[in-house]
Amino acid sequence: MPEISVIMPVHNVERFVADAVRSVLEQTFENFELLIIDDCSPDASIAICETFDDPRIRIVRHTVNRGLAGARNTGVRHAKGELLAFLDSDDCWLPGKLEQHMAHLQARPEVGVSFSRSAFIGEDGTPNHCYQMPRLTDIEPGYFLCRNPIGNGSAPVIRRAVFDDIRYIADFLGSFEDWYFDEHLRRSEDIECWIRIALTTDWLIEGIPEPLTLYRLNAGGLSAQLFKQLESWEQVIEKTRGYAPDFVAKWERPARAYQLRYLARQAIRLQDGSAAVQLVNRAFRTEPRILLQEPTRTILTVGAAYLLHLVPQSLYATIENRAQRLIGNAQAWRIERDMGSRIS
């Protein structure tokens, strides 16, 4: 029986999926199964997956496209392991990821969700030398609404018992199923799940300092998707309001400002200066105190948005490259410090 079930939704990722599968098969912890969820992928993604000859791989096929939430739900229902790890099929893991999360969860039985920091990579897999640097411990529910410390869907490893605690029954095409992620959400479904875990269970959510997830920056998205993502986030707010109205009343305004700031950074990555400026301005109108609460990140976001909007692209690229090197070096130093503290 596998100790860990790795759940990988697959849809239209033929350029990246082989790297994702290899990163799982190369794990130093070997007692796992890899559940590849074919979400009606129209390209050669599944054919590529079928070229891997490893008995730990199982392919589960959908008859209709259900999105990330639906694919993850299918994976949870089929999983045999007591720990469930999630990997988006355009991302990758470093070889020690599963081993380190297993050790973390064994050492901390009160932790239900273990996540890692993530390193950014380009579409071609080249390291970006910058990292997602979330808070790792003492994470209150409001922090999930404001900043989503888990960061991306390829970072967490979660106990099955956590999903047992948040399971609910939903009607899908006339058939009742166990749901864990909300399939009504095509975006922000992971944030909604983490908030529900934080608010409705006693499990702790903690991170480990190593950047064990490689998070691919895919420029194929359109800036219009940013505003659809904001709409999905608003749906998360309304769902949460239904069972935790006092919590939402306290956190809604600052959380919306942080979400707008996050989307501004996404617009910057998409090289859309106009959208970035619009989003940072909305963030400040919503809650000016984000400048006092997180001055460095907020100032960097505002500066990048206006530079991208106002200066020639070649000059902006030069400034951005230098800034990324400085930020990446500072982040790498902090990671080394945190890893040393953890070992000692």
Q: What is each model feature region?
A:
Residues 1-25:
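N-proximal low-complexity "stem/linker" segments adjacent to membrane-targeting elements
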Residues 62-79, 89, 100:
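Glycine-rich, basic loop-to-helix element that forms the pyrophosphate-binding segment
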Residues 23, 38-47, 64, 88:
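A conserved acidic beta->alpha catalytic loop
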Residues 1, 199, 210-344:
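C-terminal subregions of glycosyltransferases and related glycan-biosynthesis enzymes
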Residues 77, 134-231:
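Conserved nucleotide-sugar donor-binding catalytic segment
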Residues 96-130:
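Conserved donor NDP-sugar-binding/catalytic core segment of glycosyltransferases
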Residues 2-5, 33, 192:
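Cell-envelope/extracellular polymer assembly enzymes that use nucleotide-activated donors
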Residues 84:
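Short aromatic/hydrophobic "clamp" motif used to bind/position activated sugar donors
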